[in-house]
Every structure is written in C-alpha cells, then in structure tokens.
C-alpha cells in the first residue's frame, strides 16, 4: 500500500512539474513578446504624435467673426535613420533565440523589410517565425481636411480629419479639434506694427496599426497578427506672426502631452492563444509623454485662397503644405 501511494505521488509530482514548466515557458514567451513590442512600436507612435502636431494654426491674426476656411493639406513626415532599427541579442530573451546568431539588427515599425528568425521550444514543439517588417518608407505622407470658423471676441475653432491612410505594412488615421484666441487685439502697439500674437490649444486622436506576427503553433495561432496604438494628445501652441503685404510669417512654440494605449489582435478565423494574455501585459508599455517642438509657417493670400507651408522641428522633422478657401 505504501509503495502504491509513493508511486501515485511520483506520477502526480511529474504532472505538476510539467505544468509548472509549461507555465514558465508561456510566461517567458509573453515577456519576450512584450520586450519586442516595445522596441518595435514605440518609435512609430512617437512619430505619429509629431505628425498630428503640425500646422494647426492658419494665422496668428484675429479671425473675422463667422469667417469660414476649408483646406486640403498634405503632411510629409521624414523618418530618421535612428528610429528605423534596433539591436537584439540572445541575452535579451528568455524564451526565444536568434537562429544562427547571437546578435542581430532588426527593423522597427518605421524600418525596412529585413528579417531574422526567432526560435523557441514550447512543451517540445518548436516555435519559429520571422521578425516583423517595417513600413520601409523614408517618408510618410497622408492627406487630411481642415476647417476653421471665426467666433466672437477673437476666438476661432478648428477641426481636422483624415481618412485611414494605407501604409506599406499598416495604416494611420488622425482627427481632432482646437480653439485659438488672439491676444494682440488687446495691444494697439502690436497691431499698428502688424504683429500678431495668439495661443491655441488642440486635442487630437491618432490611431496607427501595423502587421505584427502571424505565428501558428499546435496550440493555435499566437493572436499577434496586428499591433494597434491609439494616442490621445493635447497640444498647446504659442504663435507670433508678422504681416508683409500678402504674406504672413508665423513662428510657434508647441508643447504636447500624449497618452498611449496599445492592443494586439489575431486572425478572427483562427483561435488566438496569447491575444488576451499579451493585451493584459501591454499596459506596462503605456506611458504619458511630453514633447516640445518649434514650427515655422509661411502663408500667402491671393483672392479668396491662401497657401500655407509649415515646417515643424524637434525630435523629428515634419513638413506640411495646404491650400485653403475662405468664405466671408
């Protein structure tokens, strides 16, 4: 009887040990996925904030009451080399290893299409996949519509909307609204010299998605096919401008604060093994960030139209061009 009890205990302890080992392996896999997600997606979400910060203010001048502008804009973001790639080594991972190497350089979401294989063993089954590609674009261009309406007392309301812009490995969309107030109206000395002073605050929502990892295992699909980031950003802009005949030259200082939210999703036609688990871990990557940038804008008025070009600079460089029509 004693021998039988000991035998049963040995069998049960084996099952418990195996379960603990499998749980540990899954934990290591999720930890590695979180590490890679951070390095891969954060440069793109930081860039999205800069794109959404550009060219909100059409003029630092006081807008006439009920005057309405409607414009078509194109935003051009220049992807810096430093944010296109990152280095990994086997010491960075607990579950995976780089196939055939100890170190490698891989693309971020903003990078090229170079790939390496990562391999791991989950309960005796090999998991092997290529690292995700980047968008492989040196510039990111997206169009959007922007409208503004003059309100009483030197206020102006602005709205912005872009359709979902397709990237090579994902898509991007932004919308938002803002409120501007002109302060130079209170200083006759500034107005007499055609110098304008305004402050504007804006809210924007940016959503950026990328193809991430499509990995099938005996346990099902990992459920990491798409990586999506939603960013809520509040912008604050102080602008000074000078009128020179039909031109207005605007210089601005912009500060913004952003809250980041991340989510992965799988292929709905297949079972997703780790989708829920990794989504529970992704809040560890979420952060609140402040950014500061400068902006130079040139505006040229002709008839009821005006053309505008804005150059935003700081951590990133962004160019914005637009043509607007004014309805008095």
Which sequence ranges carry the predicted segments?
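Bacterial Sec-dependent N-terminal signal peptides
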Residues: 1-24
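Outer-membrane beta-barrel biogenesis signature
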Residues: 19-118, 192
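Short loop/turn motifs that connect adjacent beta-strands in outer-membrane beta-barrel proteins
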Residues: 58-66, 81, 169, 184-197, ...
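Residues on the lipid-exposed face of transmembrane beta-strands in outer-membrane beta-barrel proteins
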Residues: 59-61, 70-72, 145-151, 177-183, ...
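Residues that define the transmembrane beta-barrel architecture of outer-membrane proteins
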Residues: 64-66, 138-143, 171-177, 193, ...
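Transmembrane beta-strands of outer-membrane beta-barrel pores
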Residues: 74-78, 161-165, 183, 201-207, ...
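Extracellular/periplasm-exposed beta-strand and loop segments of Gram-negative cell-envelope proteins
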Residues: 83-85, 121-137, 166-172, 205-233, ...
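Repeated loop/turn-to-beta-strand initiation elements of outer-membrane beta-barrel proteins
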Residues: 154-157, 186-189, 246-249, 302-309, ...
């Amino acid at each position: 009887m004693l021998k039988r009890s000991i035998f049963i205990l040995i069998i049960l302890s084996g099952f418990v040990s195996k379960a603990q080992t499998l749980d540990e392996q899954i934990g290591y896999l999720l930890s590695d996925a979180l590490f890679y997600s951070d390095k891969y997606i954060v440069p793109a979400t930081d860039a999205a904030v800069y794109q959404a910060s550009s060219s909100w203010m059409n003029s630092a001048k006081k807008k006439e009451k009920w005057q309405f502008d409607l414009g078509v804009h194109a935003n051009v973001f220049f992807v810096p080399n430093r944010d296109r790639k990152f280095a990994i080594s086997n010491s960075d991972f607990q579950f995976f290893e780089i196939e055939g190497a100890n170190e490698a350089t891989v693309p971020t979401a903003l990078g090229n299409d170079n790939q390496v294989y990562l391999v791991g063993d989950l309960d005796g089954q090999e998991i092997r996949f290529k690292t995700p590609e980047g968008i492989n674009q040196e510039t990111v261009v997206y169009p959007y519509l922007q409208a503004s309406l003059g309100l009483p007392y030197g206020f102006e309301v602005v709205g912005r909307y872009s359709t979902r812009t397709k990237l090579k490995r994902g898509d991007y969309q932004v919308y938002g609204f803002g409120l501007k107030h002109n302060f130079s109206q209170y200083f006759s000395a500034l107005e007499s010299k055609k110098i304008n002073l305004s402050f504007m605050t804006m809210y924007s929502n940016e959503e950026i998605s990328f193809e991430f990892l499509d990995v099938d295992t005996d346990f099902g699909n990992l459920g990491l096919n798409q990586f999506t980031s939603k960013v809520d950003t509040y912008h604050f802009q102080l602008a000074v401008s000078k009128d020179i005949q039909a031109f207005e030259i605007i210089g601005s200082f912009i500060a913004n604060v952003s809250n980041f939210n991340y989510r992965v999703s799988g292929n709905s036609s297949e079972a997703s093994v780790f989708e829920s688990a990794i989504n529970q871990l992704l809040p560890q990557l979420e952060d609140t960030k402040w950014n500061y940038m400068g902006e130079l804008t040139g505006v040229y008025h002709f008839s009821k139209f005006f053309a505008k070009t804005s150059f935003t600079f700081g951590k990133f460089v962004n160019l914005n061009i637009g043509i607007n029509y004014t309805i008095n």
